[in-house]
Amino acid sequence: MTSRGMKRRDLHLIFIIVIAAMEMFPVVANCQVKRALLVGISNYSSNRVTQWTDIHGANDVELLASTLKSQRFKITKVTNQQATAKRIRKELASLVKSCRAGDVVYIHFSGHGQPVEDQNKDEADGWDEAIIPYDAQKVYSKGKYEGANHILDDELSSFFSQIRTKVGAKGFLCVVIDACHSGGASRGEEMEEDEEIFSRGTRDGFSSTRKPYRPPVNTNGHFVINSSATQSGIVILEACRSYQSNYEIKQDGQYYGPLSYYINKTLKSSQLLKSLSWVQVVKRLMDGDRRLTKQNMVIESSLK
């Protein structure tokens, strides 16, 4: 065999070995997984004991699922009667367990929110914030319902911290809360005549002492979350400030949470990346909607 033939054979063998190695041990870049947990509740009133009004949180989930799927996210959807406190906690715990280094994680909640009287005295204003699962009751009742199904911000923060640690510095966590921890009865002058008012949240705090909820007026719209060399970057987006109401908007005959709608619109043409650039686009769109002049999106982020 000529030296040229031997070289060709050797190159062919090397090529086969490289391909086999790539299949057995994929490069790290290809190991990144995009994961999304989407929770949305519309039909609260079908569980009459909870006393919550119907909204359109499940619409947000369906809207976003299609867009995130096009960006190759592995999607878990939990809506309406499925979205109990037990199920939401189970899915969050499962997400923590399944995450790997370098993953991109998106968590979305569309539903009601409520302020809850602070029990461990770690809140300056005396109130925690809670997302409201399908089976969380609106009113405190001693010995009957004392808030077990409210999912507090402290509990959510623990899940978020665990995810940030699992995905590490090369990963990313984005959290969207299209709810509200206040609520109102009217929106303003930019509504269409045939447009109903759907507000997410309530002004009634969940309190064993019937303590009235009086949120401080903080006009800061951007808060800094501490960064860590061993944890991923994080962005948390909220539909409005603590003293404002979050009103649904009507688009193409359907009602959506405004934050969800404009995130979806932005992600139609932008990738969900570890960056604030696409977040700023969402903010500009919300600021430009005349129906939303009385609410301001809030950004919490460890990114610079």
Walk through the language-model features, giving the residues of each.
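Bacterial N-terminal signal peptides that target proteins for export
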Residues: 2-15
